[in-house]
Amino acid sequence: MTALPSSAPPLLAAHALTYSRNAIPILGPLHFHINPGEALIVQGPNGIGKTTLLRILAGLLHSDSGHIHINTHHNTTAPERTRHIAYLSHLPGLKQDLSALENLHFLNALHGCHPQRTPSNALTIVGLTDHAQTLVRQLSAGQKKRLSLARLWLSPAPLWLLDEPYANLDPEGITLLNHILTTHLHTQGGTLLTTPGALPTLPVPTRLLHLQKAP
């Protein structure tokens, strides 16, 4: 898994990040970067701090020390980061009493939409056209996961942070996610994704960051 050289500045660079909880070290010090067109895969067992790292990068938690540069800007605030980052947690983050299509329109109003994509197109991409008017609470777990992928496909953000995106996906869903990721990276986007075990195989430049217990 090797990355191709890039002359463009990194989409994200982290330097000496540390984080502790109740005086117990959880992360760090961590140093890494994500270039346009590549994926950084963060691997480590459950409880090692993968989700914590993503929340720090998304601006939802504060690191104890270290620096984060996003599009060369130093330690941007959470509202500024939302313009550059799409964060997909292990929870769907969907409105249960809205339809699948209404959810996508609602999220687009909050975060913006890729200029060449529409919610209806997104539902077609993930195979949910027939469920456009179905309330989210009536969708299966697999369908909710696909709707989350539709939300990701619509995002205009250049950097995607994905918390165990391959969890609970069937083979067709894995193929779909690989297609969405590959399309994003081929347009010089970047992604950081976490996995507790086996590494996903992507036809794009990738690097590995293996998290270990903080000293």
Curated annotation (Swiss-Prot):
PROSITE patterns: ABC_TRANSPORTER_1, ABC_TRANSPORTER_2, CCMA
Principal place of residence: membrane
Membrane topology: Peripheral membrane protein
Record-linked SMART domains: AAA (SM00382)
Statement: the UniProt record of this protein carries the keyword Thylakoid: no
Reaction(s) catalysed (UniProt annotation): heme b(in) + ATP + H2O = heme b(out) + ADP + phosphate + H(+)
Gene Ontology cellular component terms for the protein in this record: plasma membrane
Keywords for the protein's UniProt record, in alphabetical order: ATP-binding, Cell inner membrane, Cell membrane, Cytochrome c-type biogenesis, Membrane, Nucleotide-binding, Translocase, Transport
EC number: 7.6.2.5
Residues binding ATP: G44, P45, N46, G47, I48, G49, K50, T51
Subcellular location: Cell inner membrane
Molecular function in Gene Ontology: ABC-type heme transporter activity; ATP binding; ATP hydrolysis activity
One annotated GO biological process: cytochrome complex assembly
Assembly description: The complex is composed of two ATP-binding proteins (CcmA) and two transmembrane proteins (CcmB).
NCBIfam families: ccmA (TIGR01189)
Family per record: Belongs to the ABC transporter superfamily. CcmA exporter (TC 3.A.1.107) family.
Function noted in UniProt: Part of the ABC transporter complex CcmAB involved in the biogenesis of c-type cytochromes; once thought to export heme, this seems not to be the case, but its exact role is uncertain. Responsible for energy coupling to the transport system.
Name assigned to this protein: Cytochrome c biogenesis ATP-binding export protein CcmA
Species of origin: Xylella fastidiosa (strain Temecula1 / ATCC 700964)
